[in-house]
Regions:
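A generic secondary-structure signal
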Residues: 10, 111-115, 162-166
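Anionic group-transfer/hydrolysis microenvironments
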Residues: 23-24, 82-83, 130
Length: 170
């Protein structure tokens, strides 16, 4: 993201701050026999691939975060997207929409809860962006297989707002 890139440039000489981009490369490398990656599969059929995509997103994000914590024990770690966003925005939204089934959602929550203690989160930086702006950015970056309707981005925005408004102290 632009924000993470700019922060990384600002802290380039500070080895106490570590930056982690979204692990899209990992997602692109998981392919079926026809060469379609997980991002393509997810956006072409969310009902079928919502659970597997969310598990993969969480596992890959958690994996790079745990590695960063281990390799940089006294550093501030800034991630492009928080693992809590996986649970409280994307997985929750897909579950509410009936795209992740009840039993799969329970499995997801168990997996999430089992490992989340390994990576304590002390603060969130939330850059609120209008869905229309996000839509333009998605089109501009033109990532392979990423066809995201503006309605999906609007719902993501609403779920971010709901989750964060519940977690902001009065």
């Amino acid at each position: 993201s632009t924000l993470v890139d700019n922060l990384e440039k600002a802290f380039i000489d500070d080895n106490t701050v570590c930056f982690l981009q979204e692990p899209v490369e990992i997602w692109n490398n998981i392919k079926d026999k026809d060469g379609k990656n997980m991002i393509e599969k997810y956006y072409s059929n969310q009902e079928k691939y919502a659970f597997s995509f969310q598990m993969m997103a969480y596992i890959s994000r958690l994996s790079i975060l745990r590695k960063a914590v281990k390799e940089n024990p006294n550093s501030v770690i800034i991630t492009e997207r928080c693992v809590h966003t996986d649970r409280n925005v994307f997985a929750q939204m897909l579950y509410d929409d009936g795209k992740i089934m009840e039993t799969d959602y329970q499995i997801y929550l168990r997996w999430f809860d089992e490992f989340i203690e390994d990576v304590p989160i002390y603060a969130f930086i939330y850059l609120q962006t209008k869905p229309e702006v996000s839509f333009q950015r998605v089109q501009k970056r033109n990532r392979e297989g990423e066809v995201i309707p503006i309605e999906y981005l609007d719902r993501c925005n609403k779920y971010h707002d709901m989750w964060l408004s519940e977690n902001i102290p009065d």
